[in-house]
Amino acid sequence: MTQQIKLLVLNGPNLNLLGQREPEVYGSKTLDDIIKALTDEAALQNVALSHLQSNREYELIEKIHDAFEKIDFIIINPAAFTHTSVALRDALLGVNIPFIEVHLSNVHARESFRHHSYLSDIAQGVICGLGAKGYSFALQSAIGKLRNI
């Protein structure tokens, strides 16, 4: 049996409103729906998945710090912090855990202020515009990278 992978999923501000906030942009699934499906998918592949959603930047940073030497890979949807947070960038660089940046909407097809990410250039990859499936694609990619598949 392969060794269990420990994966952390982080979701930033306002993602707790998924399913009610702008469903034409973000889809109709709630964050709980997305995380439950992802957790089930992860368990089938011997991946232990933990999750945090926070509207507070410092809580996301603390969770990243706590992940040092405990977590193998991070999937992060930084939401609005994508475009503003040097602190999240520095935290991710500081722990040196590989990560994939995920966005439900295509940020490049939206307002110009959403086109810049403080994380993309240090991420293993970026998935945007594919809705909730983007999390599943990120999970599969993380597993592939860690297991050299």
UniProtKB/Swiss-Prot annotation:
Alphabetic keyword roster: Amino-acid biosynthesis, Aromatic amino acid biosynthesis, Lyase
Site (Transition state stabilizer): R21
Residues annotated as catalytic: Y26 (proton acceptor), H103 (proton donor)
Residues that, per the record, bind substrate: N77, H83, D90, L104, S105, R114
EC number(s) on file: 4.2.1.10
Broad class of enzyme this protein falls into: lyase
Catalytic activity as recorded in UniProt: 3-dehydroquinate = 3-dehydroshikimate + H2O
Entry keyword annotation includes Lyase: yes
Subunit (UniProt): Homododecamer.
Similarity remark: Belongs to the type-II 3-dehydroquinase family.
NCBIfam families: aroQ, PRK05395.1-1, PRK05395.1-2, PRK05395.1-3, PRK05395.1-4
Name listed for the protein in its UniProt record: 3-dehydroquinate dehydratase
Species whose genome carries this gene: Psychromonas ingrahamii (strain DSM 17664 / CCUG 51855 / 37)
